[in-house]
């Protein structure tokens, strides 16, 4: 189980009344980017790739290019007169105590806490007498705060803990084991762990996942064969036992293990892509027992939730696109023997085992609905939530009679509630001391029609009394992929934005998981254009309803959302004033050749699949659709030099292409964070700096000369 607190990224908008104008009257004199003669051939079609050399993250030439681009970008940003004022505002508002939902391990209650501006949140604990102490402080792991804490997993009795750390934002992790009572390190540090959970087998050892060390650069070389290992405490990592994966017949990119609470069964999930998995069962009490196949198809997702003796419970979308909870006996765990415990409904379901109950977390139009069931599948109660928004948490051991959950939305700072599992009685456990009154703001859910008539939900959040005059600076944020659901969460910067009259809008695009597998699939492969059409239609809705106008509309997204921004800013440049693609997947013909990129083929397809797939990808790939003679929105591309999820070469090449072909005076800049990765674990100080730059850039290019 992962317990984390990641402060939300901050974004700032400021209302302005004057007519916006071009803040950059002079043509930009960008650093020169060398072009070479690299050409690839796909199904007889030649595709030039003149910036291929920027893919070499270890070359001196690439390092010099990064230095020159950063100097140019920071020089531009430093001249914006209110950039420092925005940073100070962010720091002031960020500086409040944040706490995560508590959880019990052994004789202690643990929780994450950030005193305000700490670079990384700290894991604290209290004993039964209420005495508080620091358990793990990642701020001590490095001088600059760039080493972060990842997975933290306790053994079932809470006496041992294994945790993973990331350096410089990398997906590669190191693993450390502690005696939880004394905090003494046990054994050696494990290395080369990636995309891994930790599953304890009693107090003897644990299962974890990794790839072989890649040939070439660790930051960009392809990683393909995921493997599950067992580490026995007190033995060197080189002696770890390979449990699953690594053979020619088992070419899985994502392998993970889960152990039942009674340490009787090991469940192995194996996947080729980010959607769909096979599930296997191993009897840990019988070393000679064969590996049992539970599901043997990659067309659905199935995961182990809990067991009651020999009765196993699984969450699955097999023959149930919105999800259901099923049970089966360990002797016959295959789908043909499954029995529904909580059947599929029209709303998307995810399940947690909490105490001696199941908590069903439904998404109703991308908003939380929580129901409590017993192990017979009988409804106990629906949990009453404070408002519309997002509820999380609901962790509890079998021996516990209460649980904690968090609640938040775009205008509601996260609060923690304590719930009695037997009676359902709920009380406020913790409330942040932040000078923000949610009653002054409104989150409104609207539904608009996309290009093909599909109804798409969107949350629009703003200060009550806003004027619908088309002059409100507006940030339209999107993702639309990988079955990821965008549910309402609070951020300090959005609060500032709304205080000053700004609008924050988040549509739930196809490709996400808001309406189950069918909604996800409708935004994948040769239906990816649906995602872009949904986002463009959201922009049109905001403009038509007078929330904003093209001169006051900025768009932002990260990772797959960076692809969304890159594609839509090229397809409809006249709709947007500012574009902010972050750590984006921007070269759709080569994305699958880097690190874990091949695992994204379920959503994208690859240029090697077929001529038709190649042509489709080429038709929207941001890198390959920049045209001369077009004035694109003012663009600030952001990436990290240690991003080994979506390698920075995507952003490097896209920036070079845009700078070479941009017409007009809207700037094309790239901001490359050093010693930083894909985003998770980014220090608070770096996050504030980046958001100050993003918002200063946005406002300056909307024509704002000074802050109100």
Where would I find each of the regions flagged by the language model?
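Beta-propeller blade signature
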Residues: 125-126, 176-180, 224-234, 280-284, ...
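A conserved hydrophobic secondary-structure block that centers on an alpha-helix together
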Residues: 134-197, 203
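A flexible loop/linker signature enriched in serine peptidases of the S9 family
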Residues: 114-121, 142-146, 165-174, 189-194, ...
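Hydrophobic beta-strand positions that form the internal "hydrophobic ladder"
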Residues: 109, 158-161, 206-207, 266, ...
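Active-site-proximal cap/loop segments of hydrolase catalytic domains
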Residues: 506-708
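Non-catalytic accessory segments flanking enzyme active sites
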Residues: 60-153, 164, 253-283, 288-307, ...
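Cap/lid segment of the alpha/beta-hydrolase catalytic domain
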Residues: 139-155, 165-170, 184, 419-425, ...
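C-terminal motif of bacterial Sec signal peptides marking the signal peptidase cleavage site
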Residues: 13-15
């Amino acid at each position: 189980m992962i317990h984390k607190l990641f402060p939300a990224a901050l974004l700032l908008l400021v209302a302005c009344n004057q007519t916006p104008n071009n803040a950059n009257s002079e043509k930009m004199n960008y650093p020169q980017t060398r072009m070479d003669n690299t050409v690839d051939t796909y199904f007889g079609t030649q595709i030039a790739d003149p910036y291929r050399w920027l893919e070499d993250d270890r070359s001196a030439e690439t390092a010099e290019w990064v230095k020159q681009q950063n100097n140019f970008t920071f020089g531009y940003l430093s001249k914006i007169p209110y950039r420092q004022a925005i940073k100070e505002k962010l720091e002031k508002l960020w500086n409040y105590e944040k706490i995560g939902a508590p959880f019990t391990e052994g004789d202690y209650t643990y929780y994450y806490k950030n005193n305000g501006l700490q670079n990384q949140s700290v894991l604290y604990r209290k004993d039964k007498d209420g005495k508080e102490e620091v358990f793990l402080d990642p701020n001590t792991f490095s001088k600059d705060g760039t080493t972060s804490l990842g997975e933290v997993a306790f053994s079932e009795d809470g006496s041992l803990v294994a945790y993973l750390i990331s350096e410089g934002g990398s997906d590669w992790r190191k693993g450390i084991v502690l005696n939880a009572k004394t905090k003494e390190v046990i054994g050696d540090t494990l290395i080369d762990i990636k995309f891994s959970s930790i599953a304890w087998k009693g107090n003897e050892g644990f299962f974890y996942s990794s790839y072989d060390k890649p040939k070439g650069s660790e930051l960009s070389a392809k990683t393909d064969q995921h493997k599950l290992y067992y580490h026995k405490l007190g033995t060197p990592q080189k002696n770890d036992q390979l449990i699953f994966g690594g053979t020619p017949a088992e070419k899985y990119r994502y392998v993970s293990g889960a152990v039942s609470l009674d340490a009787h069964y090991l469940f192995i999930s194996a996947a080729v892509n980010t959607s769909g998995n096979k599930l296997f069962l191993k009897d840990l009490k019988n070393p000679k027992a064969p590996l049992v196949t539970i599901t043997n198809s990659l067309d659905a997702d199935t995961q182990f939730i809990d067991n009651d003796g020999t009765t196993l419970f699984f969450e699955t979308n097999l023959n149930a696109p919105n999800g259901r909870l099923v049970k089966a006996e360990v002797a016959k765990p295959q789908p043909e023997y499954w029995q529904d415990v909580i059947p599929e409904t029209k709303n998307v379901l995810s399940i947690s085992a909490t105490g001696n109950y199941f908590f069903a977390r439904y998404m109703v139009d991308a908003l939380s609905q929580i129901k409590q069931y017993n192990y017979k599948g009988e409804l106990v109660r629906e949990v009453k939530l404070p408002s519309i928004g997002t509820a999380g948490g609901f962790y509890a051991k079998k021996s516990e009679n209460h649980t904690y959950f968090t609640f938040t939305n775009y205008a509601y700072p996260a609060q923690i509630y304590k719930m009695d599992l037997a009676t359902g009685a709920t009380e406020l456990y913790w409330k942040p001391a932040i000078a923000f009154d949610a009653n002054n703001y409104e989150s409104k859910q609207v539904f608009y029609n996309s290009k093909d008539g599909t109804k798409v939900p969107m949350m629009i959040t703003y200060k009550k009394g806003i004027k619908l005059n088309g002059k409100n600076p507006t940030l339209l944020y999107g993702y639309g992929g990988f079955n990821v659901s965008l549910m309402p969460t609070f951020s300090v910067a959005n609060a500032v934005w709304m205080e000053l009259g700004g609008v924050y809008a988040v549509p739930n695009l196809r490709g996400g998981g808001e309406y189950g597998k069918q909604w996800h699939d409708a935004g994948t492969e040769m239906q990816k254009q649906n995602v872009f059409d949904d986002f463009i239609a959201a922009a049109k809705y905001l403009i038509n309803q007078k929330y904003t106008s093209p001169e006051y509309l900025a768009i932002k997204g990260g990772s797959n959302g960076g692809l969304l921004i890159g594609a839509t800013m090229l397809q409809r440049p006249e709709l947007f004033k500012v574009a902010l693609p972050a750590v984006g997947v921007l070269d759709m013909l080569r994305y699958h050749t880097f690190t874990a990129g091949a695992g994204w083929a379920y959503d994208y397809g690859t240029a090697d699949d077929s001529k038709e797939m190649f042509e489709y990808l080429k038709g929207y790939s941001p890198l390959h659709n920049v045209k001369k003679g077009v004035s694109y929105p003012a663009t600030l591309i952001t990436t990290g030099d240690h991003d080994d999820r979506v390698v920075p070469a995507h952003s490097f090449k896209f920036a070079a292409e845009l700078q070479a072909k941009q017409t007009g005076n809207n700037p094309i800049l790239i901001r490359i964070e050093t010693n930083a990765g894909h985003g998770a674990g980014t220090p608070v100080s770096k996050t504030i700096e980046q958001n100050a730059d993003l918002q200063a850039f946005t406002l300056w290019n909307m024509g704002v000369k000074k802050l109100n």
